[in-house]
Regions:
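Alpha-helix capping/helix-boundary segments
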Residues: 17, 112-113
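Phosphate-coordination/substrate-recognition cap region in phosphate-metabolizing enzymes
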Residues: 1-63
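Generic beta-sheet signal
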Residues: 102-110
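Amphipathic, non-transmembrane alpha-helical scaffold segments
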Residues: 15, 56, 81, 85-89
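ANL superfamily AMP-binding
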Residues: 1-5, 91-96
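Short beta-strand scaffold positions
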Residues: 12-13, 86, 107-108
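Short glycine/proline- and acidic residue-enriched helix-loop micro-motifs
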Residues: 62-83
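Acidic, low-complexity terminal tails and accessory targeting/binding regions
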Residues: 31-34, 42-54, 97-102, 118-165
Length: 165
């Protein structure tokens, strides 16, 4: 099924779980994944490896603060949401220029996906915080030479969208 989507390139976060997904997709469409650091997950700064309960107890809801752009987040070494959006759209711009009119897969993580969705749909921080991105789900964005559109979110079956590619 995936081979018929004519995937011309796969770009992946270098984080292991993303690379594994990219390799699986690549085997099915005969495309070798390209690793790109712009697709990595959010850098949690001093909160890296801390249990969520500890983070919330000492700093409140840091995830909502992250989407709101709170200075408390950056003071703790956490990458800001605007920084995540900038690096995500940096690779998206690169891909859309290099692969004009082609189907390209980006294998990434929740916050980079939310960065793209948030910008495309102009979502507020409260909505982004509540939005769940399912593991291994397909989120389809289309570009018409002027604008991006969200065609699918959290899809687990690409056959439903096969005709739209």
């Amino acid at each position: 099924m995936i081979k018929s989507l004519n995937i011309s390139a796969i770009y992946s976060s270098p984080i292991n779980r993303a690379m594994q997904t990219a390799e699986i997709v690549g085997k099915h469409c005969d495309v070798k994944p390209i690793l790109d650091d712009r697709l990595i997950e959010l850098d949690m700064g001093k909160f890296t490896m801390m249990p969520y309960d500890e983070i919330f107890a000492s700093h409140g809801n840091v995830f909502l603060k992250f989407y709101e752009g709170s200075l408390e987040i950056s003071h703790n070494g956490v990458e800001s949401f605007s920084e995540v959006q900038k690096r995500v759209f940096d690779i998206v711009d690169f891909v859309k220029n290099k692969h004009k009119g082609e189907n390209v897969v980006l294998v990434t993580h929740m916050d980079p996906i939310k960065a793209m969705i948030g910008k495309v749909l102009s979502l507020k921080s409260e909505i982004l915080f509540q939005l769940i991105i399912a593991n291994a789900s397909l989120n389809v964005f289309k570009y018409d030479d002027q604008n991006f559109y969200l065609s699918s979110i959290n899809s687990m079956n690409s056959s439903r969208f096969h005709e739209s590619f």
